[in-house]
């Protein structure tokens, strides 16, 4: 009887645009204020782990990760670097029933949406599922714990809707990163697999 080939290692992975240090620093003060008011109801994302997700792929074979990385420069070479900034705060699905807290974005959102679509198409051409949801660019800050009351949800929504940045940073998006995620008891940790320059080069 022929022995079955060992299952290929699976890697939890996603494609994202990195957020520079000044963007992370501007969010830090807001998250600290959030934490003082509603922290016991929210699991916060590590600040160093905040990123602008273009495509979440989940657990995929290691060989597929290599193929995605090989194709990524072809996608990003079709675009030019563009401006993006942090603007406003909100929650999914809404501020009345907040479950995911986020920072919003402004800038050249048309180019951002085009890159996201091109990335999704490229990944789909490799045989991975294409995104079914509308692309809503954001930076995830935290996730509301399940054991909260309606009153606590209302308070969370009110705190988030009133938040403002002292400085609204903007930057030039010039790279798209392929990342892998490792899960531990403290949450998720993200590691760079490879990067592709927007505009080529």
Language model regions located:
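Histidine-dependent nucleotide/RNA phosphoesterase domain, centered on the 2H-phosphoesterase fold
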Residues: 2-201
């Amino acid at each position: 009887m022929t022995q079955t080939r060992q299952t290929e290692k699976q890697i939890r992975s996603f494609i994202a645009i990195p957020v520079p240090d000044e963007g992370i620093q501007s969010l830090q003060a807001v998250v600290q204020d959030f934490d003082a008011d509603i922290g016991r109801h929210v699991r916060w994302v590590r600040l160093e782990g905040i990123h602008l997700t273009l495509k979440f792929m989940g657990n995929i074979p290691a060989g597929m990760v290599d193929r995605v990385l090989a194709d990524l420069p072809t996608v990003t070479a079709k675009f030019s670097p563009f401006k993006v900034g942090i603007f406003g705060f909100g929650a999914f699905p809404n501020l009345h029933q907040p479950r995911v807290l986020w920072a919003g974005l402004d800038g050249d959102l048309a180019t951002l949406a085009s890159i996201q679509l091109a990335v999704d198409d490229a990944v789909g051409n490799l045989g991975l599922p294409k995104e079914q949801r509308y692309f809503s660019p954001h930076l995830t800050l935290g996730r509301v714990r399940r054991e909260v009351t309606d009153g606590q949800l209302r308070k969370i929504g009110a705190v988030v809707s009133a938040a403002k940045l002292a400085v609204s940073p903007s930057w030039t998006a010039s790279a798209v990163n392929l990342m892998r995620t490792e899960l531990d008891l403290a949450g998720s940790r993200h590691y760079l697999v490879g990067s592709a320059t927007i505009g080529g080069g």
